[in-house]
Amino acid sequence: MRVLETIAALREYRKNLEESVGFVPTMGALHKGHQSLIERSLKENSHTIVSVFVNPTQFGANEDFSAYPRPLEKDLALCEKLGVNAVFAPKIGEMYPYEAEQRLKFHAPTFLSSSLEGAVRHGHFDGVVQVVLKMFHLVNPTRAYFGKKDAQQLLIIQHLVKDLLLDIEIAPCEIARDSDHLALSSRNVYLNATERKQALAIPKALENIKQAIDKGEKACEKLKKLGLGILETLEVDYLEFCNHKLEPLKTIEPTNTLVLVAARVGKTRLLDNLWV
């Protein structure tokens, strides 16, 4: 496995790859959710490149960029074990050669980025768009793999690729869950045993909503009330029913409905969702 730390090294490596290239962009602290994305890329492509880069531009003023976990050696060991061909792990100066005030400004499409996570984390998706575009430009992948757990991010990336006419297939990947059904996340390590049990209300609420929909309930207000009842012990940021343009729904639309939840358990903020 190659470990590439500079843009020059990545370009030199990439120019010799003639068959399909799968790309899994990450911020490191890899878990089984990331592993499922990597394994799918390995299965579907001749070469797989994983990026490990904690992107400063997607952190808000009140978010601690310096505290984000960076277990690089552990991440590299996992990638090598899985059979990844190359890991791109650049320093900030490689990805951002200019100071903030000298950089080009990137703006995620407002209709997809202003609500939900965008309303809580101002500028977050602008930073995501910025770094993903740079990575796409450098890696030039055949396919790029994104988890459905970050649903809003996935919709923005799909829109980005279509709007900018990029010849990249975006491969949405199912949400990976632990044995207790909690969605896998790098943030789960911050939960103590009590908080972990409390957090299980999130997948339970989504599962109960799904069961109600399967039985024929289509009124979003009733389904929301059902979910909030299960989430009552948590600090809920939102539980919303939207279509794939993130427009609010009053009635479930088959194949075009997202149920999105964000809630705080102690000091840890968790996301989960249901694609109907």
Curated annotation (Swiss-Prot):
Please list the residues that bind ATP. 27-34, 147-150, 176, 184-187
Of the GO CC terms on this record, one is: cytosol
Example GO molecular function: pantoate-beta-alanine ligase activity
Active site at which residues?
Answer: 34
Any one of the GO BP annotations: pantothenate biosynthetic process
Alphabetically sorted, this entry's keywords are: ATP-binding, Cytoplasm, Ligase, Nucleotide-binding, Pantothenate biosynthesis
The keyword Cell membrane appears for this protein: no
Q: What is its EC number?
A: 6.3.2.1
- Annotated localization: Cytoplasm
**Main localization category:** cytoplasm
Reactions this protein catalyses? (R)-pantoate + beta-alanine + ATP = (R)-pantothenate + AMP + diphosphate + H(+)
Q: Which residues bind (R)-pantoate?
A: 58, 153
Which family does the similarity line name? Belongs to the pantothenate synthetase family.
Protein name per its UniProtKB record: Pantothenate synthetase
Q: Which gene encodes it?
A: panC
